[in-house]
C-alpha cells in the first residue's frame, strides 16, 4: 500500500482497496424498482396451431399483468418472443397508446404482435414481456375507436380476480377457455 501511495498518492490507496475487495462507499438500502415484467415458457409439445399458441400467450399475459398490478405499476411497451423447434428466436414489440396493467389490453396487443410475427413454424417457446414501467398515473388519451371501452371497469375486474386468486389459489377463478383445455394452464410461469 505504501509504495502505491508514494507513487500514486490518494489514487494508489483506492486502487489497492479495490484490488483487495474493499469498498468504503455507502450501501444503498433502497432497491431500484423493476424496469420490466415478463414471463415465458418452454412448451412440452410443438405448438402448430394459432389457437393453442394464443392460449399460452393468454396464460402468460395473466401472470405478467397480475405482477404489474401487484406492484401497482403500468407498462407502456409490450413485446412477444417466439422460439421455433429449430431454436430460432424472433420477437416484436409495440408501444401502447397509454401505460396499462389490464390483462385484456396487454393480451390484445400480444395477439396483434404474434400475428405479425409467426410464420407457421412449430413453436417450442413463447414469451411476453413489458417495459417502460411507471408508477405515476397518466391520463388516457381518448380515441374515437375506444368510446365503448371502460378501462376503469376492466382494471377493477382484474384486481378483483387477483384478490380471489390470492385468497383461494390460481385455479379458483379462470377464463372459460381454459376449462376444457388440458394442454395449457390458466396461469403459466
Sequence positions of predicted segments:
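Acidic, metal-coordinating catalytic segment for phosphate/diphosphate chemistry
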Residues: 96-189
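DNA-contacting surface of Y-family translesion DNA polymerases
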Residues: 1-122
Amino acid at each position: 500500500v505504501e509504495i502505491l501511495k508514494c507513487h500514486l498518492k490518494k489514487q494508489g490507496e483506492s486502487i489497492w482497496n479495490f484490488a483487495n475487495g474493499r469498498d468504503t462507499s455507502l450501501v444503498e438500502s433502497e432497491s431500484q424498482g423493476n424496469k420490466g415484467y415478463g414471463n415465458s415458457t418452454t412448451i412440452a409439445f410443438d405448438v402448430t396451431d394459432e389457437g393453442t399458441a394464443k392460449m399460452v400467450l393468454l396464460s402468460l399475459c395473466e401472470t405478467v399483468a397480475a405482477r404489474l398490478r401487484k406492484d401497482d405499476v403500468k407498462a407502456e411497451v409490450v413485446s412477444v418472443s417466439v422460439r421455433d423447434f429449430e431454436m430460432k428466436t424472433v420477437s416484436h414489440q409495440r408501444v401502447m397508446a397509454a401505460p396499462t396493467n389490464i390483462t385484456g389490453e396487454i393480451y390484445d396487443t400480444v395477439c396483434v404482435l404474434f400475428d405479425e410475427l409467426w410464420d407457421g413454424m412449430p413453436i417450442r417457446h413463447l414469451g411476453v414481456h413489458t417495459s417502460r414501467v411507471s408508477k405515476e398515473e397518466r391520463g388516457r388519451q381518448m380515441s374515437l375507436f375506444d368510446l365503448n371501452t371502460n378501462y376503469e371497469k376492466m382494471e377493477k375486474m382484474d384486481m378483483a380476480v387477483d384478490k380471489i386468486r390470492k385468497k383461494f389459489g390460481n385455479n379458483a377463478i379462470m377464463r372459460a377457455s381454459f376449462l376444457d383445455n388440458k394442454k395449457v394452464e390458466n396461469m403459466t410461469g
